[in-house]
Amino acid sequence: MNVDNVNKGTHTRSKASRVIPSDLIEQEVSLESCPLSRKRKLQESEQENPLSKRKSHPLKLALDEGFNVDSNGSEETEMKERDSGTEESEATLEEIEEDSEPTKPKEAPSPQTAEAESSDKVEPEETETKTESSPPAKATYSSYHEIIANSLLNLGQVAKEALVSEGHLKESELNNEKPTSVKSGQAEIEQLMVEEACEKEIIIQTEDAEEVIEVTSEPISESGTEPRDEVNCEDTEKLQKDMIDEEEEEEDDDVDEEDDDDLEEDEEEEEEHSSEMANQDLPHASQDSPKPHCEGHFSPKPEYSVIVEVRSDDDKDDDSHSQKSAVTDESEMYDMMTRGNLGLLEQAIALKAEQVKVVREPSRSSLDNMKNFSADEKQNRPIDTMRKSFYDAGRPEKRDIKCPTPGCDGTGHVTGLYPHHRSLSGCPHKDRIPPEILAMHENVLKCPTPGCTGQGHVNSNRNTHRSLSGCPIAAAEKLTRSHEKQQQPGDLSKSSSNSDRILRPMCFVKQLEIPQYGSYRPNMAPATPRANLAKELEKYSKVTFDYASFDAQVFGKRLLAPKIPSSETSPKAFKSKPFPKASSPCHSPSSSYIKSTSSSSSSGFDYTHDAEAAHMAATAILNLSTRCWEMPENLSTKQQDTPSKSSEIEVDENGTLDLSMNKHRKRESTFPSSSSCSSSPSMKSPDQSQRQNCTSATSSNMTSPHSSQTSRQDDWDGPIDYTKPNRQREEEPEEMEPAAASFASSEVDEQEMQEMQEMQEMQEESYEDRKYPGDVTLTNFKLKFLSKDSKKELLSCPTPGCDGSGHITGNYASHRSLSGCPLADKSLRNLMAAHSADLKCPTPGCDGSGHITGNYASHRSLSGCPRAKKSGLKITPTKDDKDDPDLMKCPVPGCDGLGHISGKYASHRSASGCPLAARRQKEGALNGSAFSWKSLKTEGPSCPTPGCDGSGHANGSFLTHRSLSGCPRASFAGKKGKISGDELLGTNFKTSDVLENDEEIKQLNKEINELNESNSEMEADMVNLQSQITTMEKNLKNIEEENKVIEEQNEALFVELSGLSQALIRSLTNIRLPQMEPISEQNFDAYVNTLTDMYTNQECYQNPENKALLESIKQAVKGIKV
């Protein structure tokens, strides 16, 4: 290839320098016999100019080189390489030197050189030529690849020192006998890689470390040379297509890990430092080299190839990979690829580690290598075939790789807008993931840190991430390594670069911003080997929280350490103090941590400092998580804030937290306030001159950062007291026990809280012995209603140990009932009912269960009581109660019923919810005397029923009622009927002699007498009226009977008249009166009237005609009988 084409690829190169072994020239002769090699040479000579213009994908080009490592021919040639002699290597080096001399511009290489290069460097040369990166690749490969390039330069020094130690190459040969042009070529390559990584950040590399390859050669052997070359060519052709698909999938994972690039500056500085050391070993590195790209193929290490081990973000394997065989590595690599979790980086590292092992074992003969090669070839070929079939681009499974969340199209993901991701990380629809898919990805897509379950990560509380970004365990290990470097500066000068490679940090993690909290000195921490650290981290982190197994066996006497409050000093300033055995301190700025072990016979520091350092560092970072459920055996800590102090908290046998204040008073000299160690039966007396750790003698160890600014090594010999920073403990012995541990606001006055605590502790001294841990006495309960200034402190859940979280009604501490409290159980309610007799439901036999307003026994009304409804009790005022409005008022003197919790009305007859009662209760508590509103009702009227003391009434046990309503004795007497009305009234007046001096009562009695008299008069009038009404009713009945008789008579007369009229009509039918028609029923009345007039006025009818008419009428009427 001409120089112009080479110069075009100058600024984009692979991250590894090619190493051409000493037998390169001899191998070229054997490569000419390979038909594929000859065909590639012919194609390459025709495509020299087009190749310089085309910009292929860097991943595809890198894969061509990558699988030279996995090919069996390359591995076999490396085994054969060490058998070649030093003299032959030096002779070959001279030939390489001649080939690598600078040529003039536009001068083509000789045909022999072109044949040699094209036969042996078919794919490497293509890669070097085609690595012009496209613009999208520039954004992807940036500072992360810069670190990899620097690490390669550092590791190149490891190989050189290994050769010197084994005797294969003398130091004089390394320093003096190297050709000047070859050494200048390597120096130029290293310098360009470092400079271009910093300036342009476009160093192109494969997905993992596949370009970190050995280009090895072997001596010309009569048996197997040509077949091995053919295998190498065929494997390269076969695996090239497979790895393209595989790399495309792994490219997606790199997108998730790009956010870690800017967090790896510390590691970059270390690698650059090692690179400078490597450059110092080359005295002639300043010589010019006009062809750096071409000379990159001719490295000045004739018999040793560069072995690279780079840990990436997806590497979860330890250094134990170097102990496995090549066959096992191939099997495990395929298994990892099928799971879709590990990329090619683990494969390359494992294979390189195995090759290092083979190179360092010169006792193995060439014949054994040939046998192993033939066996590995047969075993690896089926694996390659399976790889090809699995990652075939034409298969539908390849195209269907997308987010496993059902219904997710890739939008809204944290890692970007694309549907082809294969993990649950960053998916906004993770709540819709079925348990089967979640379980399938739980063991595959998780944090690569050994022992990490995903909890405590900075970015999220999930176990599906596949990077070490934000991993607290990895961060703890990084802190430990940095402490080791600063605490043991002498060991670093003695250790070789090989040991630095082995102890390379397993991850690039985020730096904890601890220095902002004050004077943080990491050189106090000890050195912890990574093997022990990983083992301890895995031991302490694999415990899962099973809510189903929440019982007294696991959580009994579990300790909680509240957060340490600040005092005179700044709350953010602290220093880390070392332990006596150089254990790593806890670097969390504001929290204390306790490690509880299940063993009760272990001493305070009975485990090694490595385990302690690993656990304390991991615990410190895990507690930085926003949501981290502590494990039951290793992280039994929980942070709680108090305004001025912290309380001693304990979990009893029932699994409930105990925040009561009436216990452990006599142990105040044993336990400091900042930590709870109540599971330990005995403790040493705390040192009173310094802040100390509370170390349990039997079950727990606790470390905590604090605000002290000075520390001595001998201060750690005894337990440390954190209770009184910068002052003596004897000054304030009463402040050990706070009022209650809650999330109260800092607005509460500290002095007022201390006074309340002291008052309460004085009242509770009589309740200390033989008490249930969750006791709530009347005094304790009524302290919830103290001053308005401490409103947020007092309005908390009355359940002992409840901080308000987990309630059905919400996560707040301001509720004042047990309703919805997850920690309130039946035994606790019964216990509270036993100690608060006046805070019960007034219904007889009601324990408070089944109420509409909640299942608790602290209610004091019949509202919602199911038993009150069943028994038919009425809570409405009766007639006698309504007569006197004074009976409907609050019994507390001076209360008008306003401001009551239960409502703004005056009809209640108890002190429940009365603000005046609460205020006087507070005054009584501050004065040292218990307050009871019943004492205000001893004077006054009592029940008027003889022998009744007020008990057993339906409306409550009160002495203030002045009526017979609800009195069981009065109702019993009324049912028997033994007391008449007059006797009852007389008894009423007799029992009212106590109130004779009351003018109001006298006036009422007088009015009652007047009413009685008027009632008597009205009753007499009513009797008279009733008699009159009776008389009138009798008269009315008589009249009605007479009317009936008359009606009957009238009816008989009408019948008779009808008969007469008919007879008259028949008789006078033939007689016609003048000027009248014959008689009929229609004119009967007129005919009768005319006849009557004729007989009345007979004088007018004296003429003969009229006389004859009258005679005829008389004759006709004679026959009619009336």
UniProtKB/Swiss-Prot annotation:
Residues that, per the record, bind Zn(2+) 4: C841, C846, H859, C865
Binding residues annotated for Zn(2+) 3, in chain numbering: C797, C802, H815, C821
Region (Disordered) residue spans: 1-139, 208-334, 479-499, 566-595, 634-770
SUPFAM superfamilies: CCHHC domain
Residue ranges with Basic and acidic residues bias: 118-131, 225-243, 290-300, 310-322
Keywords: Activator, Developmental protein, Differentiation, DNA-binding, Metal-binding, Neurogenesis, Nucleus, Repeat, Transcription, Transcription regulation, Zinc, Zinc-finger
Ranges in coiled-coil conformation: none
Pfam families (UniProt xref): MYT1, zf-C2HC
Keyword Transcription regulation appears in the UniProt entry: yes
Function summary: Transcriptional activator which is essential for neuronal differentiation. Can promote ectotopic neuronal differentiation and confers insensitivity to lateral inhibition, but only in cooperation with bHLH transcription factors.
PANTHER family per record: MYELIN TRANSCRIPTION FACTOR 1, MYELIN TRANSCRIPTION FACTOR 1-RELATED
Family membership: Belongs to the MYT1 family.
Name this polypeptide is given: Myelin transcription factor 1
Annotated source species: Xenopus laevis (African clawed frog)
Gene name tied to this protein: myt1
